[in-house]
Amino acid sequence: EMEPRPDTELPKTTCEEARRELLLHPDPDSLAAYEFVFDSTYAAGAPQLEEYGARTLKPGRPLAEAVIELSTRIHKEFSYRPQSTSIDMPLEEVFKRRQGVCQDFAHVMIGVLRSHRLAARYVSGYLRSGAEYLGAEASHAWVSAYIPGYGWLDLDPTNNVLPKQGHVTVAWGRDYGDVTPVKGISLGGGGQAVDVAVRVEPFL
């Protein structure tokens, strides 16, 4: 079971009700969330992702309950293997291999939700140093799903947790391409190397 539990009781809004609200977007929050229903470069819906999600995102089921179970399923059914994938690997291939790193887990979950016309965004940040989490002391990625009547619910399928104080959000977007830590073109001769170290500690 995923831990920790949400601080507040989650609404019983069903998957169908969430789709309808996103389509009609009757308020500013659902309107802002609507852009995260659509495919993006690294997190697009696909038939196999839709089929995978159908087992969990069932008609009449509360969406919040369903996305928590979906995150747990990905955590259990996919293997965390550093350097087993690259950002250029198609999402369908990542899904077929059932292995990867945090950005792959996040893209798979986002792709599943978008296949069901639900809003999900990619969150980039860091984990608290010393925590017994996969991906600690390096950049990390997780998912945020839009729950009408609640807002955005963060889920970390890599570690099967609901992110709280141990997760430090830096940015969010449609997928990794929106929040890359380094982007651009470098011109000139000579070799280059980037060396980065990160340590996250509580502020007392």
Task: For every predicted segment, state its role.
Residues 72, 104-186:
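Hydrophobic/aromatic-rich core segments of domains that either
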Residues 4, 16-100, 108, 174-176, ...:
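Secondary-structure boundary elements
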Residues 1-10:
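Glycine-rich, N-terminal phosphate-binding loop and its surrounding beta-alpha-beta segment
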Residues 9-19, 157-161, 185-187:
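Short intrinsically disordered coil segments
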